[in-house]
Amino acid sequence: MSESAPVGRSCPTQKPIATSVILAYNRLHNAIRTARMCRVRKGSGMAKLVFGMNQSLDGYVDHMAFAPSTTLFRHFIEEAQGQAGSVYGRRMYEVMRYWDDDHPEWDAEEHAFATAWRNQPKWVVSRWSKSIGPNASLVEDDLEGAIRELKAKRDGEIEVAGPDLARSLTELGLIDEYRIYLHPVVLGHGKPYFAGPRPPLRLMTTDRIGEDVIRLTYVPA
């Protein structure tokens, strides 16, 4: 007669196996859900508006506080190369114009990012800015109409840059995806990722980028 495990205890191998099965199922479920979303978007013939920024553990964004690792910077280069364009508020656009001019201290990857950024069409939402750089257009009036037309006429992914602009577009129901690049840093103060009330969201995927950054991808619920 063979011995059996005591009542109330499972065999030592059952828990790891069960955990592996659950993790595998979750990964498969996320992959299927993401694939379905991609098929719908591909068939819609409309651009996808994406808001992504680096964020601290306590919810703040500050481009001066997050020096990207080599892996993360390469990721941003690939993102910029693949995007159909970017929509900026005035202040964020002025910050990003740093990439319009070459700098002698740049390495090859910084040159690669600058090239990708310059090649992108850019739309600057501002009633006051009259000076814009190459490959950029002003959006001065009717933000909702302009962005809806932009999404209808373009294919691919269009980046939204800056939490204030993202707040306005969120309130209009125009952002299709939110990407939070979560860093193991606590700032204690600053500009929050969500400049207004957080909209209802559904988590779609999580990715680890490099050693210490987790990307959380959400869509409107």
Protein language model features and the residues they cover:
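Enzymes that bind and transform nitrogen-containing heteroaromatic metabolites
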Residues: 22-221
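Low-acidity, Ser/Thr- and Arg-rich intrinsically disordered low-complexity segments
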Residues: 2-4, 9-11, 20
